Amino acid sequence: MNHQTQTLSLEHFVSLEELSNQEVMSLIKRSIEVKENPSNIGFDKDYYVSNLFFENSTRTHKSFEMAELKLGLKTIEFNADTSSVNKGETLYDTILTMSALGLDVCVIRHPDIDYYKELIASPNIHSAIVNGGDGSGQHPSQSLLDLVTIYEEFGYFKGLKIAIVGDLTHSRVAKSNMQVLKRLGAEIFFSGPKEWYSSQFDEYGQYLPIDQLVDQIDVLMLLRVQHERHDGKGVFSKESYHQQFGLTKERYKHLRDTAIIMHPAPVNRDVEIASDLVEADKARIVKQMSNGVYARIAILEAVLNSR
């Protein structure tokens, strides 16, 4: 390995819940270090990785690809549409095959919650598993890039007031973030349609209408309305959702001077956020995308350090 500062070693990367606060902070600081000194990365041997995405993705998929290229990894192409999955091959057998072929890392996005548990429990699968999102379960790499973005802005988490707003029930981003942010000392609030709020969130924070939050918070974390995961529960027109729960131009005026706006993207413009605000001064949405590459470099380094 060319660099000396990255010492964190992880067998797999499937959920931030499984990492200690120290390990999470190590990943955050390494991400920022890579961003500030991108020449200080790489390995002195070849590693092989494949990105196996069974759900649509732009940012996660392409930023993992970019991270892999920057690290000098050998990427093996995988397309679910042209693979034996269409012949009925299970995810387990697909990854068993990839492991047998000698892949060091499998980055996977799959619609099944906790799909990775069977894979990491298998004595015959030797590839490191990196979770690129499991249905409406977890999205740990997105959560890490969000943490990096917040830490870059404020330099701490303890005492920060963070509102997570929108499609809470269906959001793997929300689940990953509420858990780790509370653990790191942030004060969490929730808002959005009550139909998409569950009592399971009560242990992490308090639900309040968005108009009671905008002038009180440090971070406004908006969530995409996930139409593809809805079963008809809580149907809103774009206009009504935006006016009731979205970041309108009027609500934007009430944000603190130091507050920032975040969104995991893709953004439904004029639904979760007014289109003109996506690149506003307080918005960090584009920065999140950029930070995704550095966060995923840190993740890949950590799992390859255990090889």
From Swiss-Prot:
Gene3D superfamilies: Aspartate/ornithine carbamoyltransferase. Coiled coil: none annotated. One of its GO terms (molecular function) is amino acid binding. The keyword Transferase applies. One of its GO terms (cellular component) is cytosol. It comes from the Bacteria. L-aspartate binds at residues 87, 172, 224. GO terms for biological process: 'de novo' pyrimidine nucleobase biosynthetic process; 'de novo' UMP biosynthetic process; amino acid metabolic process. Its EC number is 2.1.3.2. InterPro entries: Asp/Orn_carbamoyltranf_P-bd, Asp/Orn_carbamoylTrfase, Asp/Orn_carbamoylTrfase_sf, Asp_carbamoyltransf, Asp_carbamoyltransf_Asp/Orn-bd. It catalyses: carbamoyl phosphate + L-aspartate = N-carbamoyl-L-aspartate + phosphate + H(+). Pathway: Pyrimidine metabolism; UMP biosynthesis via de novo pathway; (S)-dihydroorotate from bicarbonate: step 2/3. Keywords: Pyrimidine biosynthesis, Transferase. Catalyzes the condensation of carbamoyl phosphate and aspartate to form carbamoyl aspartate and inorganic phosphate, the committed step in the de novo pyrimidine nucleotide biosynthesis pathway. Heterododecamer (2C3:3R2) of six catalytic PyrB chains organized as two trimers (C3), and six regulatory PyrI chains organized as three dimers (R2). Belongs to the aspartate/ornithine carbamoyltransferase superfamily. ATCase family. This is Aspartate carbamoyltransferase catalytic subunit. It comes from Streptococcus agalactiae serotype V (strain ATCC BAA-611 / 2603 V/R). The lineage of its organism: Bacteria, Bacillati, Bacillota, Bacilli, Lactobacillales.
